[in-house]
Amino acid sequence: MEAPRSAPRERERARTTSGSDQVHSWILVTSQVLSAAWRIARAFVMTTLSPLSATFSYFRSLYLYLGHQLKWWIGYLQRKFKRNLSVEAEVDLLSYCAREWKGEAPRARLMRKAYEELFWRHHIKCVRAVKRDNYDALRSVLFQIFSQGLSFPSWMKEKDIVKLPEKLLFSQGCNWIQQYSFGPEKYTGSNVFGKLRKCVELLKLQWTEFSGMRDHHKRGSMCNSLFSDAILECKLYEALKFLMLYQVTEAYEQMKTNKVIPSLFRLLFSRESSPDPLSFMMNHLNSIGDTCGLDQIDMFILGYSLQVKIKVFRLFKFNSRDFAVCYPEEPLREWPEISLLTENGHHYHIPVF
């Protein structure tokens, strides 16, 4: 009686087990199919994206390279074609002061007061910053001579200054001039006379051109062009140095014959470092443009040689009698006046009234 009742249970259990196995098989098959499909899809995506990724990486590298090259060429062209003016354009005096002298340090306060003095009492409204080097005093003076169209000094009208180097050698026996040094170039040798002659010839040519030009704006434009050429500038400054040496030599020859000479030359020859023209050249003049600029006695000689009254506002001497000084102190004639300003006695800028 028990056997017939148990047979249906067994059949039911068998059907249940069979259904479970089928479900498990379907799940397994589905999982395998999905896994295979995922592998195929991933392989397809990787196969598709790899070239795209490589292409993107290539163009990104190319973009960075071209950007770097473009930046380099822009900088190169700017450096090549930008005028490197050694005398900058006019800027408002008080704005320049505010930019350069900030803070409450004692020196900054002194400079601000000195600039205010220039603005209100001396009616200086603008300033032209001058390149800082050991030629800046000569540059500041010559720029104003050219920009104002000043004429030749009287003594330069009477003599051909281009022939002065040979005159010193052959007429006055100054063979020591072969030791003349051209600023940082430090050139000495048998061709000194040829180099000096070219420098003086350039100065005469440029001075003649500027002094004969009546158009103020045209003079200004030509000044900007000339004072952006470092090679021509150096030649002009060496010509000025030579004219100073010539005047010192002339005064020395006059002193030897007991003639009256300006007091500034007596002061020059009384110094241990410059008792004669050779010592002056070796100990002072040759260093100008190289290791030092002009000192006070050099400024006197420069003003005398060019027949201009050089008025210097020395801002570091504010509130003293030496705030404004002139070189020479007492011009022999009514020479034209040009002005400089200095914050430390070494570097000069151009005030604009």
UniProtKB/Swiss-Prot annotation:
Q: What is its main location?
A: cytoplasm
UniProt entry keywords in alphabetical sequence:
Cytoplasm, Endoplasmic reticulum, Membrane, Nucleus
The protein's superkingdom reads: Eukaryota
Sorted alphabetically, the Gene Ontology cellular component annotations on this record are: cytoplasm; cytoplasmic side of endoplasmic reticulum membrane; nuclear envelope
Task: State the annotated membrane topology for this chain.
Answer: Peripheral membrane protein
**Record-stated family:** Belongs to the peptidase C65 family. Otulin subfamily.
Subunit info here reads: Does not bind ubiquitin or ubiquitin-like proteins.
> Anything noted about its domains?
The N-terminal region that precedes the OTU domain mediates interaction with cellular membranes.
For this entry, the protein name equals Inactive ubiquitin thioesterase OTULINL
Q: Which organism is it from?
A: Mus musculus (Mouse)
